[in-house]
């Protein structure tokens, strides 16, 4: 339930979203100005099963609009080429929850799959992206006694997006072809990884009606735009452009 602000949660695993603007406990660290806390779903003595499907097919979307240059003599009259771009998204999940030991040990488990596809076409090249990475979530609640609770929260949300880039084939005269609208000559392919793993173990002891003891340990492994294979040395250098401008400067 805590420390999840650094990890993407499957939507169907969220029970509540809380906004705290003050008076929150030390488990939220030294944050200032308020926090957003996610409360995950948990199991109970009742069995529950369910699932969801979110589908955004390519044929259900309007085509993008091209943006044209005002200069009719421009080599590429299209400023932004969008009309052939396509995208589709499919996210599906299934969950189950219930008692492992009645009145004492409960679970909530969820698995989520996805199939997201995008085709982007530019003036001189194109790119295809796909994401089919599964994700999972597990919550265990163990009431050791009526006054002692042990909770485990586990999350796997690593996401791999595959990229394929292409050039448009040249004409018979070796000239560039613009706005072809299909993938032709492969250039490279690579993956971008985001997310990772999260594990939280929390103990809560209700000592008296006015005194509660809580202890928590968490582990988080999170990647941000990690590329495989890695970029070659020097790729982090900035781009440099040279324009044929006429100036009054004489070398």
Regions found by a protein language model. Give the residues of each.
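Short acidic, glycine/proline-rich loop/turn micro-motifs
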Residues: 2-3, 61-67, 76, 119-124, ...
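Glycine-rich, phosphate-binding/catalytic loops in enzymes
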Residues: 34, 68, 233
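Short, solvent-exposed loop/turn elements at domain surfaces
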Residues: 27, 47, 57-62, 224
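Transmembrane beta-barrel wall of Gram-negative outer-membrane proteins
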Residues: 48, 82-161, 190-213
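Short acidic/polar hinge/loop motifs at secondary-structure boundaries
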Residues: 1-21, 64-87
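Transmembrane beta-strands of outer-membrane beta-barrel pores
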Residues: 23, 53-59, 102, 113-117, ...
